[in-house]
C-alpha cells in the first residue's frame, strides 16, 4: 500500500502549476473538483500506463489541462463535442468535466483498448459527461451524435488527415478546433494541397508555440488524393 501511495503522489510543484493554470483558464469550484478527481486518477494510471509524456508531469495543469480548457474560450456556446483520438483525456475528459456544469457532453474516440478503459473510468470518477467509442476515427462516423457543435483533436494526426475525418461532420454545421504546435504553418500549407479552407488561428493561452486552428468551412480540392484516395 505504501508503494502504491508513493507512485500516485503528484510532482512536488503541482499545486503551483494548478494555480497558474486556473489563472489562465478559470473554472467553477464544481468543475475544479471534477478536474482534481481526473488528475488523481491519471497519476495513478500513469505509474503503469504511459498516458502522457513523463517529462510533462510537473506542468500537467498548464501543459495539458489549461491547454484543453482554452478551447472553451474559442467556442463558449458549444455543448456537443467530439474528440478524435482522446488518449489520456486531453482535451476530451477536461471538456467533459466542464460540460457537466454547462449541460453538454463529449464523445471521445480512442482506438487503444487500454486507453479507452481509462477514459471510461475517468468519466465515471470525475463526473464528466460523455461517452467513449473504442474505434478508429474513420470507422466510427455512424456512431457519432447527429449534430456536433465542435470537433477537437490534439497530437493525433497531421492537419490534412484530421480535416478528412472532420469534413463529413462539418457539413452538418459546427466547427473544428485542432490544437497544433510550432509547425502549424507547414501543416496548413500541406492541407491546402487537398482542401480549400479559411482557417482562423488563435495563439495558445498557455504560451510557447502552440496554436488553435479553427475551421468551419472546408471543400475538397479537385483531382487530389488523401491517403491514396481520390478526392
UniProtKB/Swiss-Prot annotation:
Cell location: Cytoplasm
NCBIfam families in UniProt: rsmG_gidB
Protein name: Ribosomal RNA small subunit methyltransferase G
InterPro entries (alphabetical): rRNA_ssu_MeTfrase_G, SAM-dependent_MTases_sf
GO MF terms, alphabetically ordered: rRNA (guanine-N7-)-methyltransferase activity
Family annotation (PANTHER family): S-ADENOSYL-L-METHIONINE-DEPENDENT METHYLTRANSFERASES SUPERFAMILY PROTEIN
Stated role: Specifically methylates the N7 position of guanine in position 527 of 16S rRNA.
Pfam families in UniProt: GidB (PF02527)
Family named by the database record: Belongs to the methyltransferase superfamily. RNA methyltransferase RsmG family.
Main location: cytoplasm
Binding site for S-adenosyl-L-methionine: 85, 90, 154
EC numbers for this chain: 2.1.1.170
CC annotations in GO: cytosol
HAMAP family according to UniProt: 16SrRNA_methyltr_G
Highest taxon of source: Bacteria
Catalytic function, reaction form: guanosine(527) in 16S rRNA + S-adenosyl-L-methionine = N(7)-methylguanosine(527) in 16S rRNA + S-adenosyl-L-homocysteine
Keyword check for Endoplasmic reticulum: no
Organism from which the protein derives: Rhodopseudomonas palustris (strain BisA53)
CDD domains in the cross-refs: AdoMet_MTases
Broad enzyme group: transferase
Keywords of this entry: Cytoplasm, Methyltransferase, rRNA processing, S-adenosyl-L-methionine, Transferase
Amino acid at each position: 500500500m505504501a508503494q502504491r501511495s508513493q507512485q500516485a503522489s503528484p510532482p512536488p510543484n503541482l499545486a503551483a502549476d494548478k494555480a497558474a493554470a486556473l489563472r489562465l483558464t478559470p473554472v467553477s469550484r464544481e468543475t475544479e473538483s471534477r478536474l482534481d478527481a481526473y488528475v488523481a486518477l491519471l497519476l495513478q494510471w500513469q505509474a503503469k500506463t504511459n498516458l502522457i509524456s513523463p517529462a510533462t508531469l510537473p506542468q500537467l495543469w498548464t501543459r495539458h489541462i489549461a491547454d484543453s480548457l482554452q478551447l472553451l474560450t474559442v467556442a463558449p456556446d458549444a455543448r456537443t463535442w467530439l474528440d478524435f483520438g482522446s488518449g489520456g483525456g486531453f482535451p476530451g475528459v477536461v471538456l467533459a468535466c466542464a460540460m457537466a456544469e454547462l449541460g453538454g457532453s463529449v464523445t471521445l474516440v480512442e482506438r487503444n483498448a487500454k486507453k479507452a478503459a481509462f477514459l471510461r473510468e475517468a468519466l465515471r470518477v470525475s463526473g464528466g459527461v460523455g461517452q467513449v467509442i473504442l474505434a478508429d476515427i474513420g470507422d466510427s462516423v455512424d456512431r457519432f451524435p447527429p449534430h456536433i457543435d465542435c470537433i477537437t483533436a490534439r497530437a493525433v494526426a497531421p492537419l490534412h488527415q484530421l480535416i478528412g475525418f472532420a469534413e463529413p461532420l462539418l457539413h452538418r454545421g459546427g466547427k473544428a478546433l485542432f490544437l497544433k504546435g510550432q509547425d502549424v504553418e507547414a501543416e496548413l500549407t500541406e492541407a491546402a494541397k487537398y482542401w480549400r479552407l479559411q482557417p482562423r488561428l488563435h495563439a495558445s493561452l498557455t504560451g510557447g508555440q502552440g496554436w488553435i486552428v479553427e475551421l468551419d468551412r472546408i471543400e475538397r480540392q479537385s483531382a487530389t488524393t488523401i491517403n491514396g484516395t481520390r478526392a
